[in-house]
Structures are given as structure tokens and as C-alpha cells.
Amino acid sequence: MKIVLAAINAKYIHANLAIYSLRAFSDEYKEQIQIKEYTINQYTELLHQLRPEMPVWFGGPEVSYDAAECLQRNHGVTGILRGEGEESFHELMQYYIGGSGKLQDIRGIIYREDGLLVDNGWREVMDLNKVPFVYEEMEDFKNKIIYYETSRGCPFSCSYCLSSV
């Protein structure tokens, strides 16, 4: 099985730190993980029609905020990783690629099962020291703007913004 990590609305010159963190955190599955940066949300329904057996997962603050509503609007999406996704993503890799574990045991996800939404709750905030350095192979970032995180989210929790989620 191949895993594609796709950044929504990523520009050519911007590297999406989140998807590189997911790949780095699940290093033992690196050969199965491909990174694509383009607008995927418009293609999920088409992907579902062409390959209904292929799981499609979303993640990030935009979908974490109201994950159930997002799943109801996007029938081609299997589930959503909510909040910080590295540990949940790693467990999804163990489930799909390694053949171990159960979806109902993975904290931080909401997904479809037999037409119903199953909400496993939010995962605890992780220790950022566990996330490996993502820029080991700098040739992947030639002519791109790269990002460094010194903290997660925004501390201000403005009512109109999802960056603090």
C-alpha cells in the first residue's frame, strides 16, 4: 500500500511542514509515504468514485474544528485526524500498512464505519521533542520557503481563527 500525504492549497514555493512532520514521525513507513502538495479537497469525491476502497483521511485545524460536519459534507473522506496528528497518523500507518491495531483504539480520529460516524475523542497534546527534525534531506526543499516550528498553534484563541485549534 502507498500512502500519499497531500497539502491543501499549498503553493509551489512553500513547503508544508505538517506533512513532512507526519512522514518523519512514521519513519519506518517512509518508503510507502509519498508527499504531494496541491489542492486535494476538490478531488476527494472523484477519488472515491474511482477507487471507493481507497481510504482518504483529512487533518489539520480547518477540519479538526468541526470534524463531524466535514465528514458529512465530504462523503469521499474516510476519516479525520484531529489536533496534532503525528501519533494518530503513526497508528493509522500501523493499521493500514502493518496490519496491526484497530481504528477504534486510535485516539484523535473520527471516521466512518458502517455508515455511522465513530468519534474516538481528542488525543493528548504531544511532547514536540518526539518529532524528528524534518529537514534532513535539504534537496527536497530547493527553491522553496521552509518553516520552523518553535510552538504549535497560536496562543491568542481569536474567535474568528482556527490557528489555535
Model-found features: residue ranges?
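Nucleotide-activated donor-dependent transferases that construct or modify glycoconjugates
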Residues: 1-11
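Glycine-rich beta-alpha loop elements in corrinoid/cobalamin-binding modules
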Residues: 2, 18, 22-26, 34-124
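A cross-family glycoside hydrolase active-site/sugar-binding cleft signature
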Residues: 6, 57-59, 149
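Residue-level recognition of beta-strand->loop/alpha-helix junctions
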Residues: 7-9, 37-39, 165
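Glycine- and acidic-residue-enriched helix-capping/strand-helix junction motifs
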Residues: 10-19
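Secondary-structure boundary/capping motif
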Residues: 14-15, 66, 130, 135
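Gly/serine-rich nucleotide phosphate-binding loop at the start of the catalytic core
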Residues: 31
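Radical SAM [4Fe-4S] cluster-binding motif and immediate context
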Residues: 129-165
